[in-house]
A protein has these predicted regions:
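Glycine-rich phosphate/pyrophosphate-binding loop at beta-loop-alpha junctions
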Residues: 1-51, 114-134
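Short, loop-centered acidic/histidine patches that primarily coordinate divalent metals
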Residues: 87-89, 113-116
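Active-site-adjacent helical/loop segments in soluble small-molecule enzymes
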Residues: 47-107
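Conserved beta-strand elements of the Class I
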Residues: 109-111
Length: 134
């Protein structure tokens, strides 16, 4: 809605990989541009300035995680039936929770876009190993 209707929402991405900031932001921009083009929509002028990418939740980069991330995965699956994996979605969900706490966000709606990772969730559960855990 932010880009479609010039809303007041914020678009915040959380990098979970070891990619450099510029490369990661280009990936976000490309995805948004492709979506708008495929749907015959026009991006507002200066839309790129609306993207915010947080790099502080990478936990060492791709495939690296710790017990805090595993705990979030367990909690969300037990509470909400939401399968998260330690490589992608679990790390991103943990980062989102940290971001919300650190920025003291209250009384606002948050949309977490789960981008997949279900097979990795089952690998994590079945193996029950520390995998990439720090």
């Amino acid at each position: 809605l932010k880009l479609l209707e010039q809303g007041t929402e914020q678009i915040i991405g959380l990098s979970i990989s070891s990619r450099e900031y510029d490369r990661a932001i280009r990936i976000m921009e490309s995805g948004i541009s492709d979506y708008f083009a495929k749907n015959h929509l026009v991006l507002p002028e200066g839309w790129e300035s609306e993207l915010h990418l947080e790099m502080g939740y990478r936990q060492g980069g791709y495939g690296q995680y710790d017990e805090r991330i595993l705990q979030v995965i367990r909690e969300e699956f037990c509470r909400n039936g939401l399968p998260l994996d330690p490589t992608y979605t679990g790390k991103a969900f943990w980062g989102m929770k940290q971001y919300i706490e650190e920025h003291q966000l209250q009384d606002c709606d948050v949309l977490f876009i789960h981008t997949g990772g279900t097979p990795l969730f089952y690998d994590c559960i079945l193996n029950d190993t520390d995998g990439g855990k720090k």
